[in-house]
């Protein structure tokens, strides 16, 4: 079966091998007589799924032993509230605002933190650039600094995480890596907490990944619900309440798929990074040489995962989308807040899918000349 290429920003494409394995195990997981959705989360069958998923993720992302991996619920949007509920007790919260998602983070932090300070913003550029870390106005003794390391809507990415200590701050760095998790390595020496919804690169909607340094546990505000208290969740191995069992299972299969990936001598996340660089380069290079399409983001800030682009003649938008659907190129419409088109090139998108998109874009440009 030749499946269409799904460029959705999330929920997004899941590797076909993962879907096929899940389908084969739907009625009977490993001879248990049960599907995973039917299992008790405290039964030995699901415990083995959970433990393997956690171990595989720790290996893939090279998560240090002094970090805890939590499988939670609520998505990245809920984490924008859960983070300040856990970390904002001491002092000011610093925020770097680079697009729609960090704007949402700012709004939520202001509900719970006693003081929120915008250390830097790219709003004046229309969210087409990244503020130079050397220019950030960092607060003394901040509880944490939050940034969205990949802005899904505006297509902006920090390819290198800032070193806050080198900038004179002892604040832990909190990153929302929802839309680039597992697409590239993470420098954990620069991170205190990372969170992300699973529905872009890890599996289905409903699962949220949190990776948090142990010294950041136990600082929740009194008003923080127990189910959102990172210390409580960690002490209960992500099972203080019933976890999203199906999401953890599919994520676990995705982790195993990632471990099998190879690019030359590279494997796992390193292989995926090289593959993702190649996919993004192919599409950006075509857009940049075109007289018909445009990407507005500064080259050094461009996301590898989410590539917005615009037709110079926007009256052709609907025709472009209709032709794409006819060719099996799905969900290319841009976010309603910015318009245009958006191609999301998550891990499950093969290079062949990007090649098919570029071929169609070239054909459409020629027909529209």
Curated annotation (Swiss-Prot):
GO terms for molecular function: O-phospho-L-serine:2-oxoglutarate aminotransferase activity; pyridoxal phosphate binding. Pyridoxal 5'-phosphate binds at residues 101, 152, 176, 199, 241-242. SUPFAM superfamilies: PLP-dependent transferases. Keywords: Amino-acid biosynthesis, Aminotransferase, Cytoplasm, Pyridoxal phosphate, Pyridoxine biosynthesis, Serine biosynthesis, Transferase. It is an enzyme of class 2 (transferase). Binds 1 pyridoxal phosphate per subunit. One of its GO terms (biological process) is pyridoxine biosynthetic process. Signal peptide: none annotated. Pfam families: Aminotran_5. L-glutamate binds at residue 42. Its cofactor is pyridoxal 5'-phosphate. Its EC number is 2.6.1.52. It catalyses: O-phospho-L-serine + 2-oxoglutarate = 3-phosphooxypyruvate + L-glutamate; 4-(phosphooxy)-L-threonine + 2-oxoglutarate = (R)-3-hydroxy-2-oxo-4-phosphooxybutanoate + L-glutamate. Pathway: Amino-acid biosynthesis; L-serine biosynthesis; L-serine from 3-phospho-D-glycerate: step 2/3; Cofactor biosynthesis; pyridoxine 5'-phosphate biosynthesis; pyridoxine 5'-phosphate from D-erythrose 4-phosphate: step 3/5. This is Phosphoserine aminotransferase. It comes from Paracidovorax citrulli (strain AAC00-1) (Acidovorax citrulli). The gene is serC.
């Amino acid at each position: 079966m030749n499946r269409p290429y799904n460029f959705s920003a999330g929920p997004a494409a899941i590797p076909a091998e993962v879907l096929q394995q899940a389908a084969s195990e739907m009625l009977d997981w490993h001879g248990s007589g049960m599907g995973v959705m039917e299992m008790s989360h405290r039964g030995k069958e699901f415990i083995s799924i959970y433990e393997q998923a956690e171990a595989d993720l720790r290996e893939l992302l090279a998560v240090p032993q002094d970090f805890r991996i939590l499988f939670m619920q609520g998505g990245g949007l809920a984490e924008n509230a859960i983070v300040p509920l856990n970390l904002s007790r001491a002092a000011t919260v610093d925020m770097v605002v680079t697009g729609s998602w960090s704007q949402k983070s700012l709004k939520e932090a202001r509900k719970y933190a006693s003081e929120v300070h915008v250390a830097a913003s790219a709003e004046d550029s229309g969210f087409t650039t990244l503020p130079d870390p050397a220019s950030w106005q960092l607060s003394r003794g901040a509880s944490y600094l939050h940034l969205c390391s990949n802005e899904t809507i505006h297509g902006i990415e920090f390819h290198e995480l800032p070193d806050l200590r080198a900038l004179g701050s002892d604040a832990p760095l909190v990153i929302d890596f929802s839309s680039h998790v597992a697409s590239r390595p993470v420098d954990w020496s620069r991170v205190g907490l990372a969170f992300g919804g699973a529905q872009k690169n890890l599996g289905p909607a409903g699962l949220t990944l949190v990776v948090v340094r142990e010294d950041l546990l136990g600082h929740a505000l009194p008003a923080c619900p127990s189910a959102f208290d990172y210390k409580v969740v960690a002490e209960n191995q992500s099972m203080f309440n019933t976890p999203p069992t199906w999401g953890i299972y599919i994520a676990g299969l995705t982790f195993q798929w990632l471990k099998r990936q190879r690019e030359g001598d590279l494997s796992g996340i390193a292989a995926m990074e090289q593959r993702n660089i190649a996919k993004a380069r192919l599409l950006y290079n075509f857009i940049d040489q075109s007289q018909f399409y445009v990407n507005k983001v500064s080259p050094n800030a461009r996301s590898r995962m989410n590539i917005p682009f615009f037709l110079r003649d926007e009256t052709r938008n609907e025709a472009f989308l209709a032709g794409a659907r006819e060719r099996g190129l799905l969900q290319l419409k841009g976010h309603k807040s910015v318009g245009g088109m958006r191609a999301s090139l998550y891990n499950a998108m093969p290079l062949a899918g990007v090649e098919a998109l570029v071929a169609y874009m070239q054909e459409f440009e020629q027909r529209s000349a």
